[in-house]
Regions:
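Short, acidic (Asp/Glu-rich) active-site segment that either coordinates a divalent metal cofactor
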Residues: 1-56
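Glycine-/charge-enriched secondary-structure boundary and capping motifs
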Residues: 60-61, 65-183
């Protein structure tokens, strides 16, 4: 968690937000989904799929890696704090499942919940931008979808996470449950 460097790419495996949406569905806080969509989200919450194979492929390649248990933004914040860097991500690049997209279509305000909720147990990792081909090979060998969502930047004052398109996506950073730092 402590070797991310300025210029590293930020990646996440699988999809983000299914865990927290599954919990919301179980507790009656999410409605308007088809039974299969609801079942998918609940299953992702109840039985997360750890990405052990991918983690093994990333040994010696990733500069920092953490599972997304506290929420994408919080866990990226842990990498930043431990590595004494900042991060800049594009929320629109964060991979979201089809059931989660359906939920977002009826309530776009849920995007902040997807980014700050937890229990996805996907891998969030950094790797040098010059290692994109090696990352692609590792991802292909592991058979897990991975998305590049941003880059590590030098921390100007305090380590933190910036979401470049938060306002355009209607993400209310004040209520998203995480600290937001700008360069």
């Amino acid at each position: 968690r402590s070797r991310a460097q300025d210029g590293d790419d930020i990646y996440v495996s699988g999809t983000i937000g299914d865990g927290v949406l599954g919990l919301r569905a179980l507790t009656g806080l999410l409605s308007g989904l088809s039974a299969p969509a609801r079942d998918h989200l609940i299953a992702r919450y109840r039985v997360p799929e750890p990405r052990l194979g991918l983690g093994l492929k990333l040994i010696g390649l990733a500069t920092a890696c953490i599972d997304v248990s506290d929420g994408l933004i919080a866990d990226l914040g842990h990498i930043c704090e431990n590595s004494k860097v900042s991060a800049r991500i594009t929320a629109a690049s964060v991979p979201v499942s089809a059931p989660a997209r359906t939920a977002l279509a009826s309530d776009p305000g849920l995007f902040a919940t997807l980014l700050s909720g937890g229990d996805d147990y996907e891998l969030l990792f950094t790797a040098p931008s010059g290692a994109r081909d090696a990352v692609a090979v590792a991802v292909n060998e592991a058979g897990i979808a991975v998305a590049r969502i941003g880059a590590i930047t030098r921390a100007e004052a305090e380590a933190g996470v910036e979401i470049t398109d938060a306002e355009a996506l209607g993400i209310d950073l004040k209520t998203a449950g995480f600290k937001h730092f700008k360069d």
